[in-house]
């Protein structure tokens, strides 16, 4: 077992602790393999009634090891990229199909690949310190780890909004949105974790509290009006009719990789008609294209490595993107 994942049995549960705090518990291939192996073993241990996963430090999991993926892209190592995403998406499916209760305790940053090892589980507990986001369009990827399945199934057009804009949700907001199932105050989280080990997942009902009001509630009508559109062009047009809020969201979208916003819209839109395995297959296929696109290397440089946050996208505007090329990538 890798030092970055601690796996052990505690009472009636198998515990998984993501233990790479200096990297905000970002998932590398070794961690993905360790998580998968533990889940597969514990599936067949009768004494283990549930699995609990949490993160060490201030993050649950900040996503995949995007630096390593960029390095592979720069080196032209498509086999390493394929292996990483293939194994990550296989883990997402293992979690989604897991026969035993799977409980994610989210008490910090949960983004991208972190949502992938959280949202597919049966129970997702969020505290007031939790922060959920799918920020992939900002680095010229797309909402993956099964997001093309779960985003279209969130209320109204909220999923498309979250997937394209990368908007961050606090813990209570994640419950309202459907990404989390229970809100538990941070002060009670360790007691809940201990109770699950002795009394099982029934403890969730005892510790969960009513979520504070949804901070996006006032924006939901506009989100639904705009992001329910059948094309990205129509979303952009509708946003021009929404005053200051629409201007803000337009500016957000136009700051993202133009190509990424287009292919992200396309694959999330298609995900509404696919089951999870089909979504994961389509996502893996799309990674082969987007990691060869110059925007991916540039986006990770600007947002993750150099952190100047001034990416030079190519092309630089949504209207300049070859829509036919994007459509071919999505086939």
Predicted regions and their residues:
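Glycine-rich beta-to-alpha active-site loop
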Residues: 95-139, 161-162, 166-171
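Loop-centered beta-sheet repeat module
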Residues: 152-198
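Amphipathic alpha-helical blocks and their helix-capping loop/short-beta junctions
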Residues: 179-256
